[in-house]
Amino acid sequence: MKSMNRSVQSPFLCSSSLSRRPLCSSPLFFSSLLPFSSSTMPTSFRKVLAHGTTMLDVVYRNLSNEVSFFLQQLKEKWFDHAADHEKFLGLDLEYPANQRGVAVIQLCFARHVLIFQWARSDKNCPELMEFLRSGITFASVDIRNYKLKMRHSFGIEIPAGCLVDLQTIFRLRHDRTSMAHMAVALIDESYGDMKTSFPKSQHRLWEKGPLDDINIEYAAKMHTFHTSCTARFESSTMASVTLRNVDILI
């Protein structure tokens, strides 16, 4: 399978190595990527604490033309210049209250998260649809349901072999392999309550515009789980490290 290098360059990245240099602290870098004034568009830039001292750079948007520009920057500034083994993104979906479609789409690479509120957009973003089925490899959990949701909501299929289910890579020896249990074993113990600490009432608000701060933070942390686990898989495999209480299945 393909894996992701933590030091890969991205349109959001101000330093050349996430592991050795500090991330930028100003949202001005984010807005400099956009062809619009940040005062005239419903876009927010923020930092979210994932765990410990690990900060996430998060962009929240609900305009399709902004997402199109982001994907163009992503391709030109990062994807086209990355090595094959670095072309790996996290993919996550949040659902509306009736569970019949997609409310929010998240893309993540390294510590940088795009949250696109599909439910509040004009639902006309062919560039995003093309990006999803362009052959890029995505990491996720519960991919069978995701495939059904994308087929129903977008009428698209991510190519076979381009959507990797992390639950087929990792198996916990003493716990069921849920997202929370995997995050505790592979990333940090603080992820143990990431599901239960998020109020159930907020799950009904993924279509609310703008999203509440708690929803944005939850989406960012949940989504970064995918790329963090992928990076952990890569580092442990390359270094022949045995993960405590975790079996690597491939």
Q: Can you name each region flagged by the protein language model?
A:
Residues 220-221, 225-250:
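Acidic two-metal-ion nuclease catalytic site recognized across multiple nuclease folds
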Residues 2-14, 18-89, 166, 239-250:
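N-terminal accessory regions of nucleic-acid-interacting proteins
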Residues 57-73, 84-89, 95-232:
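Conserved DEDDh/DEDDy metal-dependent 3′-5′ exonuclease domain
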